[in-house]
Amino acid sequence: MDFTEAYADTCSTVGLAAREGNVKVLRKLLKKGRSIDVADNRGWMPIHEASYHNSVECLRMLIRADSSENYIKTKTFEGFCALHLAASQGHWKIIQILLEAGADPNATTLEETTPLFLAVENGQIDVLRLLLRYGANVNGSHSMCGWNALHQASFQGNAEIIKLLLKKGANKECQDDFGITPLFVAAQYGKLESLSILISSGADVNCQALDKATPLFIAAQEGHTECVELLLSSGADPDLYCNEDNWQLPIHAAAQMGHTKILDLLIPLTNRVCDTGPNKVSPVYSAVLGGHEECLEMLLQSGYSPDAQMCLVFGFSSPLCMAFQKDCDFFGIVNILLKYGAQLNELHLAYCLKYERFSVFRYFLKKCCPSTPWDHISEFINHAIKAQTKYKEWLPSLLLAGFDPLNLLCSSWIDSVSDDILIFTLEFTNWRRLPPAVEKMLSARASNSSWALQQHIASVPSLTHLCRLEIWSHLKLEHLQSDGFIRQLPLPRSLHDYLLYAEVLRMNEVPELAVFQDGEISETT
């Protein structure tokens, strides 16, 4: 039911007179014996109307008509007494009259809100002084979540009220239901003056909420540079862990949210154990997660490792692997990581296949030859199988870069890929001299496959093909990063083409591969 809207047809004539401050009409109604305790749809009686609308004389008349404690303290359906309503509007005289008549300065609404809290919320310092004079409790919970008046004053940045509450004995370390103190609130919302007052009063700058977040962490997260500076100069610890897993620090928050000025403050002060330490998470991951290139470069420039440590928290083996999840920031982040020496491996090639970044796949092959043995060959093959429908965009590049096709010829590849792909893979081998285990799997596959696959396996490789394989066996992997080395061999162009499998590519209608250039990758790479 909506208790915020007053329905005109539910308000009594006495209530309406009190609302309008019509003393003359109210006096006549009282003389006629009209009731003063008829409630409207919100549970508001005439005493509530007079208090909320600052009808001083009407309130006095109502109290003279019934000065009982029950009437003075009567509540609306939401648990507001007349004192709450007057405090919410800052009606000093009304509040004085109610308090003198016996109103409870510590009364609470259904949401456990006190008149003192409402006075603070509305910035009514004179009302606050009056309530305190009549015994309002400056401590304790003033709202349902345990948030009290000092929290509210700190949130609003009301310096006068903060000073008054502290002077009257407010607990500067009071916590709400989430373990948050007023100082934490000031840091969270960037209330620099509130923060300064609380620090000067001795409030703990290293307090922690129930989730272990600190004022420094929350200020760094929210981008309040001046608050971060004040906290650091006041003894806030940048190495105090801010989560249960003991890895999250203020530097992570600044990096993830892109607050470069704060990051610049924290980099020289933060212990480097988070860089590559086991069971930690490098802030490099945070910068990549947030997609903030400037923060990423700041960290790497200051000496943080571009490879970091394996991150079980986010499920990535390196920041470069995480970068694949960043659509709009991908190329900028990858370029920065490579610029600072990020090590490429087969997992990065696998992620290229997973996210169908085939141009980047070819670029990575150029930057990092597929050296053996691979530590994550199974994961690579799984992604390769899923990307088989677009094999022409990546498989030729992989095999021409010197990747041993025998690494592909495992049971999952042989059983899963199409005949065309399997035949294409075999073109880079001597298919009549394969390991027995591979021959057995191919024979089983061929028995249930097309005539083309059966014919290919049964055929004898040409002498020229065997010579090609022999020449390739003497090439180093770095010679195969591009076709440049082979093109420079003192051989006719037709032999260059043959060594580069031109006839195989042509037969399989593989498009001409892009000519790679050194430099940064982009959407057009």
UniProtKB/Swiss-Prot annotation:
ANK repeats: 9-38, 42-71, 78-107, 111-140, 145-174, 178-207, 211-240, 246-275, 279-308, 315-346, 348-373
GO BP annotations listed: intracellular signal transduction; protein ubiquitination
CDD domains on file: SOCS_ASB3
Residues of the SOCS box domain: 441-505
Matching InterPro entries: Ankyrin_rpt (IPR002110), Ankyrin_rpt-contain_sf (IPR036770), ASB3_SOCS (IPR037329), SOCS_box (IPR001496), SOCS_box-like_dom_sf (IPR036036)
Disulphides: none
SUPFAM superfamilies: Ankyrin repeat, SOCS box-like
Pathway stated in the Swiss-Prot or TrEMBL entry: Protein modification; protein ubiquitination
Keyword Manganese: no
Superkingdom: Eukaryota
Pfam families: Ank (PF00023), Ank_2 (PF12796), SOCS_box (PF07525)
Keywords, ordered alphabetically: ANK repeat, Repeat, Ubl conjugation pathway
Domain-level remarks: The SOCS box domain mediates the interaction with the Elongin BC complex, an adapter module in different E3 ubiquitin-protein ligase complexes.
Function: Probable substrate-recognition component of a SCF-like ECS (Elongin-Cullin-SOCS-box protein) E3 ubiquitin-protein ligase complex which mediates the ubiquitination and subsequent proteasomal degradation of target proteins. Recognizes TNFRSF1B.
Subunit structure: Interacts with ELOB and TNFRSF1B.
Family, as annotated: Belongs to the ankyrin SOCS box (ASB) family.
Listed name of the protein: Ankyrin repeat and SOCS box protein 3
